[in-house]
Structure formats: structure tokens, C-alpha cells
From Swiss-Prot:
EC number: 4.2.1.20
UniProt cross-references to HAMAP family, sorted A to Z: Trp_synth_alpha (MF_00131)
Active site: E52 (proton acceptor), D63 (proton acceptor)
PROSITE patterns on file: TRP_SYNTHASE_ALPHA (PS00167)
CDD domains: Tryptophan_synthase_alpha
InterPro entries with a match to the protein in the record: Aldolase_TIM, RibuloseP-bd_barrel, Trp_synthase_alpha_AS, Trp_synthase_suA
Protein name: Tryptophan synthase alpha chain
Length: 258
């Protein structure tokens, strides 16, 4: 039986709408983790498809400066993986949450304990950007009987056979990395990006979402045309931190019709 995240996103896709997933850094709020529910409900009220929630880490190899700085602010507020898990247990939302974490915090917490502790929360997906596909067995057995999907990341340099290997049996969605490098580097796209995404979309039987560097209205239109939706991180994180208006951008993304 498909997991909740898969069913939710497939329903949006079937309705002919673009999927929109914003990224936020847990604890990057003037109230620290006490402000997490407020941010989640703000995004939920705007109609987002799911919400990616980052766990701060001191060595975030895939993060650009905006998200790296957000992680440092979160750590300065005292955010820990344990405290985040306890906070997530108290948050009620109909929107699926997807945890984005490097493997080290997960390893320190204990993968089995982490999954068990999140069993009754809104967390329905897990992204581990520094976990190679060959080491997915460190995590997958603990997710097998849960409603949490392990999300595969597929980079631009991935050939068709490798793509098939990475996404075989995957749940939730495929995270298509739009740029070579860290998050937030908008516009630095390869010439064959659209071809790559169309190819990936053809071999995947779950939604394909494009992320890394997506930040403009033009990006929304481009990537919704060749994939099932977008993930936006740095633009959202920066706006929330600086108190900049972001509602119109989110509403445009949520309302995108195929």
C-alpha cells in the first residue's frame, strides 16, 4: 500500500496541479523551536503540498550560505535533534512533513529510535543528502513498516540506468537536483537540464520534484513544465528570517496549473 506522502502528491498531480514544497530550517525563528508550529501553520494556510523541515548541522555540505546561516542561527537557539523530535510530537497539521537531515545527527540519535519516535507525528518523509544509495540499507529496514518514505536524490550527472537504480521502489517523490553544487545558486543551470528532467520523469512512477536554486516565477514555470513540481528553500528561508513578504510567491506556486 502506498505511503501517505506518495498518495498525497499523486492526488495533486492527478488534479493537474503543480506540487509545491517549501523548505524551512527547524529552530530558525525568534522563538526557536517554539515558533516551528507557527511557521508550519502559516505555510499550511497558504495551501502548500508538503513542508521540508531541516535539522541544523555544523557541517552542511549541500547547503548554500542562506541555509547554512539559518542552521547556525538555529543551533544558537539551542536546537537539537532530540528537542526537534519532541516538538514535532506536539504539532498537529494535515500537511505531510519531510525531514531533511545529514546522516550524522541521525546516527547520533539512533536511526531506529528516530523512526520510532516520529511514528505518531506528521513526518511522512526523510531526505538524507549525504547518504549514498549503496548505504541506504542503514536506514531503509527501519522505515519498511512505517509511513515514512525515504526520498531519493538524483543529480544531473546521473545516467539513465543509474536513475532507474536510484528510484526503484522509491516512495514519496524523486528529488531532482537542478544544479551541480549547493542550494541557493539560482540560474546556474546546465543546457541539457530540461532533457534530463524529462528523461527522469519518464522512468519514475512517483512524482519528480525539482530543487536546488529554484527561486523565481520563471523557475516555477520552467520546472513545472518538465517535472511535477518544485522545492524552494533559500528564498523561503531568507524571506521568513528577514520578515519579507513571501505569500504571493507561494500562492503563485500553489496555484500552478499544468
Amino acid at each position: 500500500m502506498p505511503k501517505t506522502l506518495t498518495k498525497k502528491l499523486n492526488a495533486i498531480k492527478a488534479a493537474g496541479k503543480g506540487i509545491f514544497v517549501p523548505y524551512i530550517m527547524a529552530g530558525d525563528h525568534e522563538k526557536g523551536l517554539d515558533g516551528l508550529a507557527e511557521t508550519i501553520h502559516f505555510l499550511e494556510d497558504l495551501g502548500v503540498s508538503a513542508i521540508e523541515v531541516g535539522i541544523p548541522f555544523s557541517d552542511p555540505v549541500a547547503d548554500g550560505p542562506v541555509i547554512e546561516e539559518a542552521g547556525l542561527r538555529s543551533l544558537a537557539h539551542g536546537t537539537s535533534t532530540q528537542a526537534l523530535v519532541e516538538t514535532l510530537k506536539t504539532i498537529e497539521t494535515e500537511i505531510p512533513l519531510v525531514i531533511m537531515t545529514y546522516f550524522n545527527p541521525l546516527f547520533q540519535y539512533g536511526v531506529e529510535n528516530f523512526v520510532k519516535d516520529l511514528a505518531d507525528t506528521a513526518v511522512k518523509g526523510l531526505i538524507i543528502p549525504d547518504l549514498p544509495h549503496e548505504h541506504a540499507n542503514f536506514v531503509e529496514p527501519f522505515l519498511a513498516d512505517t509511513d515514512i518514505a525515504l526520498i531519493p536524490l538524483v543529480s544531473l550527472t546521473t545516467g539513465i540506468e543509474r536513475q532507474k537504480e536510484l528510484i526503484e521502489g522509491a516512495e514519496g517523490f524523486v528529488y531532482a537536483v537542478a544544479i551541480n553544487g549547493v542550494t541557493g545558486k539560482s540560474g546556474n543551470y546546465r543546457a541539457d537540464l530540461d532533457k534530463h528532467l524529462a528523461q527522469l520523469h519518464q522512468v519514475a512512477d512517483i512524482p519528480v520534484l525539482t530543487g536546488f536554486g529554484v527561486s523565481s516565477q520563471a523557475d516555477l514555470e520552467r520546472f513545472n513544465a518538465v517535472s511535477d513540481g518544485v522545492i524552494v528553500g533559500s528564498k523561503i528561508v531568507k524571506a521568513l528570517h528577514q520578515g519579507e513578504p513571501i505569500q504571493d510567491f507561494i500562492k503563485q506556486a500553489v496555484a500552478y496549473q499544468k
